[in-house]
Curated annotation (Swiss-Prot):
Keywords: Chloroplast, Plastid, Ribonucleoprotein, Ribosomal protein. The gene is rps16. GO terms for cellular component: chloroplast; ribonucleoprotein complex; ribosome. It comes from Arabidopsis thaliana (Mouse-ear cress). Induction: Transcribed and spliced in green leaves. It comes from the Eukaryota. Belongs to the bacterial ribosomal protein bS16 family. This is Small ribosomal subunit protein bS16cz. One of its GO terms (biological process) is translation.
Length: 79
């Protein structure tokens, strides 16, 4: 199963996150299938590749709660 989840990057006390499509069998820092976004909680910047995210969601990928919330704020899940 593929999930959309966050991977921690950056330095101590200055975390930034990449939003990845990754197989659930791999750990958080493991091998990813694709990088689909970026999130910086300190400056509140978000970059999302909408076409890649929608493509993975159509194929059955499940976002984690945090990845879902970030995507929802960006307007992906407008229903």
């Amino acid at each position: 199963m593929v999930k959309l989840r966050l991977k921690r990057c950056g330095r101590k006390q200055r975390a930034v996150y990449r939003i990845l499509a990754i197989d659930v069998r791999y750990r958080r820092e493991g091998r990813d299938l694709s990088k689909v976004g970026f999130y910086d909680p300190i400056t509140n910047q978000t970059f999302l590749n909408l076409s890649a995210i929608l493509d993975f969601l159509k194929k059955g990928a499940q976002p984690t709660r945090t990845a879902h919330d970030i995507s929802k704020k960006a307007g992906i899940f407008t229903e």
